[in-house]
């Protein structure tokens, strides 16, 4: 028995010595166990130890080389003129043939980002993909993208795919920023990729489709810095939009519920963001409400442009309910009849919707409309929609116009997950500055959109039928001509009998 107890005594002796040397705290008495918490009394890391201004350093956008005109689609679908162009606020819709899938879209946008920035491939230490376009239930898009890093020998890259409807891109951006600010950061860049192919069966939902991808370079000293501590997030269980059928690209959609979920999430995220920024202000000695006036620009996840206009009006309504009733601001002139309402009781109130859309029109034109250029001409890009709006804003404004501004951003993914956060733009807009370079890099967006091929609704419908036919098919070469793609585009070359996909790049 003595021999058996000896090792235990040795362990206790070592533990006691460690306690005396202050390597570990002494064991707590039994009564204290109930009060024990792993939460430190003070922050582990001080603010001045974090990398400064972590955010978006560079940005690249990809969209397909063909589109269908929404006016043509209205005629083809035998609906009244204006249903898609006015009712949805859309003019054109980009789409992919069978030659392109989510892997090829992401390959293209990452390659373009790295070529534009001229960064070495081994300078990336984090790569994460946000998408809801799933073509394999196990193998991630991220693993396919690793092919781009093969020649550099860089396999030490963290991150993986993130999925929840249209929210995955934002989750990936937050994760990348968290990595840069963490003890795991090794000084390299993070790359965030978000992309999707949004397709619907023929009918009322089809005109809300689109396709595209965005890649963002994330690191410190960024011209678009994520404001620390200023995120309002709301998540809940809802069946507004979901994809339970793995044999089809098409979702199940409750359109009315989805819009209500979007607006409810917007209300709650905006309220939480307001509370957090007002708390920061209070600590700095500032006592006032946060309003839209504190955002120079406001971008939204954009299923269709008309919903975004309603959403900005919704934020104005939220500000209005908090404003003093005796406020003489001309902004709220004629709206006093709507005092005393509760946000949660007004989602179906058309009078409030119309009144605040009218009252907020100038704010919309100034703060949000410039961000809708890509959405207007390409449609919904799901996870990359919000970041396509960011690219549009940068392409429609000068560096001087953007310098020093705060950009509000609302991200929404059905099911549902949503966040409201903000980006602080660098003050330096001088020639050659990071901000000026970023703005210049997307200045060709209108020109690139104008260079696409216009396709008839008949041909568009045939291509959609082909996508149905080849979805999850094996041992085939996709129909189509690679020469119809933009130069430098990756495309699906073949799927073999074991579902393995081979990709090639169209000549630059």
Swiss-Prot record:
<dbReference type="GO" id="GO:0005739">
    <property type="term" value="C:mitochondrion"/>
</dbReference>
<feature type="modified residue" description="N6-succinyllysine; alternate">
    <location>
        <position position="342"/>
    </location>
</feature>
<feature type="modified residue" description="N6-succinyllysine">
    <location>
        <position position="52"/>
    </location>
</feature>
<keyword id="KW-0153">Cholesterol metabolism</keyword>
<dbReference type="InterPro" id="IPR016039">
    <property type="entry name" value="Thiolase-like"/>
</dbReference>
<keyword id="KW-0444">Lipid biosynthesis</keyword>
<dbReference type="Pfam" id="PF08540">
    <property type="entry name" value="HMG_CoA_synt_C"/>
</dbReference>
<keyword id="KW-0809">Transit peptide</keyword>
<feature type="modified residue" description="N6-succinyllysine; alternate">
    <location>
        <position position="354"/>
    </location>
</feature>
<feature type="binding site">
    <location>
        <position position="301"/>
    </location>
    <ligand>
        <name>(3S)-3-hydroxy-3-methylglutaryl-CoA</name>
    </ligand>
</feature>
<comment type="subunit">
    <text>Homodimer.</text>
</comment>
<feature type="active site" description="Proton donor/acceptor">
    <location>
        <position position="301"/>
    </location>
</feature>
<feature type="binding site">
    <location>
        <position position="208"/>
    </location>
    <ligand>
        <name>(3S)-3-hydroxy-3-methylglutaryl-CoA</name>
    </ligand>
</feature>
<feature type="binding site">
    <location>
        <position position="414"/>
    </location>
    <ligand>
        <name>(3S)-3-hydroxy-3-methylglutaryl-CoA</name>
    </ligand>
</feature>
<feature type="modified residue" description="Phosphoserine">
    <location>
        <position position="433"/>
    </location>
</feature>
<keyword id="KW-0007">Acetylation</keyword>
<keyword id="KW-0753">Steroid metabolism</keyword>
<feature type="modified residue" description="N6-succinyllysine; alternate">
    <location>
        <position position="350"/>
    </location>
</feature>
<dbReference type="GO" id="GO:0042802">
    <property type="term" value="F:identical protein binding"/>
</dbReference>
<feature type="modified residue" description="N6-acetyllysine">
    <location>
        <position position="243"/>
    </location>
</feature>
<feature type="modified residue" description="N6-acetyllysine; alternate">
    <location>
        <position position="354"/>
    </location>
</feature>
<dbReference type="GO" id="GO:0006084">
    <property type="term" value="P:acetyl-CoA metabolic process"/>
</dbReference>
<comment type="function">
    <text>Catalyzes the first irreversible step in ketogenesis, condensing acetyl-CoA to acetoacetyl-CoA to form HMG-CoA, which is converted by HMG-CoA reductase (HMGCR) into mevalonate.</text>
</comment>
<keyword id="KW-1207">Sterol metabolism</keyword>
<feature type="modified residue" description="N6-acetyllysine; alternate">
    <location>
        <position position="310"/>
    </location>
</feature>
<comment type="pathway">
    <text>Metabolic intermediate biosynthesis; (R)-mevalonate biosynthesis; (R)-mevalonate from acetyl-CoA: step 2/3.</text>
</comment>
<keyword id="KW-0752">Steroid biosynthesis</keyword>
<feature type="binding site">
    <location>
        <position position="166"/>
    </location>
    <ligand>
        <name>(3S)-3-hydroxy-3-methylglutaryl-CoA</name>
    </ligand>
</feature>
<feature type="binding site">
    <location>
        <position position="380"/>
    </location>
    <ligand>
        <name>(3S)-3-hydroxy-3-methylglutaryl-CoA</name>
    </ligand>
</feature>
<feature type="modified residue" description="N6-succinyllysine; alternate">
    <location>
        <position position="473"/>
    </location>
</feature>
<keyword id="KW-0597">Phosphoprotein</keyword>
<keyword id="KW-0496">Mitochondrion</keyword>
<feature type="modified residue" description="N6-succinyllysine; alternate">
    <location>
        <position position="358"/>
    </location>
</feature>
<feature type="transit peptide" description="Mitochondrion">
    <location>
        <begin position="1"/>
        <end position="37"/>
    </location>
</feature>
<keyword id="KW-0443">Lipid metabolism</keyword>
<feature type="modified residue" description="N6-acetyllysine; alternate">
    <location>
        <position position="342"/>
    </location>
</feature>
<dbReference type="GO" id="GO:0004421">
    <property type="term" value="F:hydroxymethylglutaryl-CoA synthase activity"/>
</dbReference>
<dbReference type="InterPro" id="IPR013528">
    <property type="entry name" value="HMG_CoA_synth_N"/>
</dbReference>
<comment type="similarity">
    <text>Belongs to the thiolase-like superfamily. HMG-CoA synthase family.</text>
</comment>
<keyword id="KW-0808">Transferase</keyword>
<dbReference type="InterPro" id="IPR010122">
    <property type="entry name" value="HMG_CoA_synthase_euk"/>
</dbReference>
<dbReference type="GO" id="GO:0006695">
    <property type="term" value="P:cholesterol biosynthetic process"/>
</dbReference>
